[in-house]
Amino acid sequence: MSDWSALHQLLEKVQPYSTAGGKVWIKVLFIFRILLLGTAIESAWSDEQFEFHCNTQQPGCENVCYDHAFPISHVRLWVLQVIFVSVPILLYLAHVYYVVRQNKKLNKQEEELEAAHFNEASVERHLETIAGEQFKCGSEEQSKVKMRGRLLLTYMASIFFKSVFEMAFLLIQWYIYGFTLSALYICEQSPCPRRVDCFLSRPTEKTIFILFMFVVSVVSFVLDIIELFYVLFKAIKNRMRKAEDEVYCDELPCPSHVSSSTVLTTIDSSEQAVPVELSSVCI
């Protein structure tokens, strides 16, 4: 659990395609969660079961009481939380790489059409088709990526699910443990012969870490909500600006938004019609 380098490298690759809020969220996730989990927190819980003692000699009673007191370790719960909140942003990164790869194919098709020698109007129509595909995917020239179209929807979905997972794990922790640990745990589970007292190791230190991780989770959740509203506001603003620009579409050339699978007809050197299919480039 102490080696998080692979996850950190993947999250670092997301930063160029994220907003300022997304970059801050990644820093908070790595510095205040992953780094702390791999060092101080894991060592603080290393003796969790070994130092859990009950004032009874009944065989099996201590193990049953420990299992009832800690259905899942705090450390393992936080590890699951880190994994779950990281998955949506990694899926967004996969979509970014897909768009970049497909954008290269579109650019290649565009170069081939420009180099072809046939009707100029047909070439212009085909180039507009490619431009429409690039716009829907959120891609631009030279394999650059702009957050728009389906890529923007993927990013907004990743933020939404991150916030859902953050809140879900906060509620799970509150339901199972609360946010403090007491030095004394009273157990009445079978096969204990009577009501027994069990004692936890370093409850104050662990309570401090629990509260710290709670604050970090709340901060991450707030960052997700702020970023979601920011991206939504920018998307609505751009949509309104686009609606205003459509007034001038009669005078200015506007890219055509066509379906993701369009069959084109080109003319080769012998003036024979050749069908060319633009494959779907977005998911």
Swiss-Prot record:
Membrane topology type: Multi-pass membrane protein
Keyword Cell membrane included in the entry's annotation: yes
SMART domains xref list: CNX, Connexin_CCC
Keywords: Cell junction, Cell membrane, Gap junction, Membrane, Transmembrane, Transmembrane helix
Cytoplasmic side of membrane: 1-23, 100-150, 232-283
GO cellular component: connexin complex
Topological region Extracellular: 42-76, 174-208
Residues passing through the membrane, by range: 24-41, 77-99, 151-173, 209-231
GO annotation, biological process: cell communication
Subcellular location: Cell membrane; Cell junction, Gap junction
Transmembrane helix listed as a keyword: yes
Similarity field: Belongs to the connexin family. Alpha-type (group II) subfamily.
Function statement: One gap junction consists of a cluster of closely packed pairs of transmembrane channels, the connexons, through which materials of low MW diffuse from one cell to a neighboring cell.
Assembly and oligomerization: A connexon is composed of a hexamer of connexins.
Protein name from the UniProt record: Gap junction alpha-6 protein
Species the sequence originates in: Mus musculus (Mouse)
The organism's taxonomic lineage, starting at the top: Eukaryota, Metazoa, Chordata, Craniata, Vertebrata
